[in-house]
Regions:
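N-terminal small-domain helix-loop-helix segment of the aminotransferase-like
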Residues: 7-99, 106, 281-282, 349, ...
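PLP-dependent enzyme catalytic core of the Aspartate aminotransferase-like
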Residues: 345, 359-394
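Conserved core of the PLP fold type I
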Residues: 60-197, 201, 207-225, 296, ...
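Conserved glycine-rich beta-strand-loop-beta hairpin in the small C-terminal domain of fold type I
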Residues: 277, 294-304, 316-329
Length: 394
């Protein structure tokens, strides 16, 4: 009989990925995914960049490359991190990964032994939880409110908990809630982190997708001790199919991530990196991000307007200033998984929120995505969802 490693008991398929299989039919009004709008992918421009790379550097593009990543792309990433996040870095402090999801996997392997403690926001990104589970840690959820992680609660946990090896956060337009940390909390967080000297994984896939309000500084830009490991990605600002993300960290930490890259995949795709780099040199990434931002701004507005009109009391929802998601809290007696089945019968899909709490509970919550559906379908789908909620109120 085949015997598997004990860590496999910790792993299960992503509930979101499983749900996406059910919602693949074209007649489903799906708020379930976290995918960019495919109609915004710069297909023609990418074809030009691809042809240019193959004509000018074809053999290099099809060959193995360095573990760290294509040098020109790492320079471009460093330049953008300075321009957009006020993070002063250079290409030697950047490792290109196969999506930021690989950066999450490496983070677990670099820092965690079985039984170590990971602190994260409550709720938090399901993909990160699943990546960390392979290393068999204990999860402690830090309470949050509309301003992000509650710092007094973080202090209490750190003062009374042993073996805290890592803190994972999404300060900008968090997945799944859409919330953004305010400036005071960012400064307070870094003050606490500097005192306890615990590594922080700052996951920032949505930071450039701000629709309104002031840009907040990245935690990495406030880092004076080299404790913040910053994860970025091209998936939300260009195209996820290239599977290109990056890690920005100080020398000692980044060296460990390099070892993980060598062991896992040797490197990220050479041709994908070179085509992305060429596209950035040939075209205007800022203009492209503005196009994405404007599209999502309109879709978010339509979703929030429809929720405000149709969602019955005592239900509540978040009003994100950017990103891809809104978060709904139902009455405590209502189970979002039961609601999900009733909505699927009406051809409407969403993600039940309990999946985003690693220690369980909170089954009266759900996540809604607005990036991938035209405005008129958002109105129809949200109206049907709210109608179904109303039918199940006590």
């Amino acid at each position: 009989m085949v015997q598997f490693a004990s860590r496999m008991e910790q792993l299960k398929g992503s509930e979101i990925r499983e749900l996406l299989k059910l919602t693949a039919q074209p007649d489903i009004l799906s708020f379930a995914g976290g995918m960019p709008a495919p109609e915004l992918f710069p297909v023609e421009q990418m074809m030009e960049a691809s042809i240019a790379v193959l004509k000018e550097h074809g053999r290099e593009a099809l060959q193995y490359s360095t573990t760290e990543g294509f040098p020109r792309l790492r320079e471009q990433i460093a330049e953008r991190m300075l321009a957009k996040n006020n993070i002063h870095t250079d290409k030697d402090h950047i490792l290109v990964t196969s999506g930021s999801q690989q950066g999450l996997d490496f983070s677990a392997r670099v820092f965690l032994n079985p039984g170590d403690v990971v602190l994260l926001e409550s709720p938090s990104y399901l993909g990160a939880v699943n990546a960390f589970k392979a290393c068999e840690p204990k999860f402690i959820e830090v309470p949050t409110d509309d301003g992000g992680m509650i710092m007094d609660e973080l202090e209490k946990i750190l003062a009374t908990t042993e073996r805290v090896k890592m803190i994972y956060v999404i300060p900008d337009f968090q997945n799944p809630t859409g919330r953004t940390w305010d400036l005071d909390r960012r400064h307070k967080f870094m003050e606490i982190i500097n005192r306890y000297e615990i590594p922080v994984i700052e996951d920032n896939p949505y930071g450039e997708l701000r629709f309104e309000g002031e840009y907040m500084p990245a935690l990495k830009s406030l880092d004076t001790k080299g404790l913040v490991i910053y994860l970025g990605t091209f998936s939300k600002i260009l195209a996820p199919g290239y599977r290109l993300g990056w890690v920005c960290a100080e020398d000692e930490i980044l060296a460990k991530y390099n070892f993980m890259e060598q062991a896992a995949s040797l490197q990220a795709s050479t041709i994908g990196q070179m085509e992305t780099s060429k596209w950035i040199d040939m075209f205007d990434l800022d203009a492209h991000v503005n196009t994405i931002r404007e599209c999502y701004r309109k879709r978010r507005a339509v979703m929030l307007e429809t929720l405000a009109k149709e969602l019955p009391e005592p239900c509540t929802f978040t009003r994100p200033d950017g990103g891809l998601f809104a978060w709904v809290v139902l009455p405590e007696y209502m189970d979002a998984k039961d609601l999900q089945m009733k909505c699927l019968a009406k051809k409407v899909a969403f993600v039940p929120g309990g999946s985003f709490f690693p220690n369980g509970g909170h089954d009266n919550t759900l996540r809604l995505n607005y990036s991938c559906m035209p405005e008129e379908k958002i109105v129809k789908g949200i109206t049907l969802l709210c109608q179904t909620i109303r039918e199940n109120l006590r």
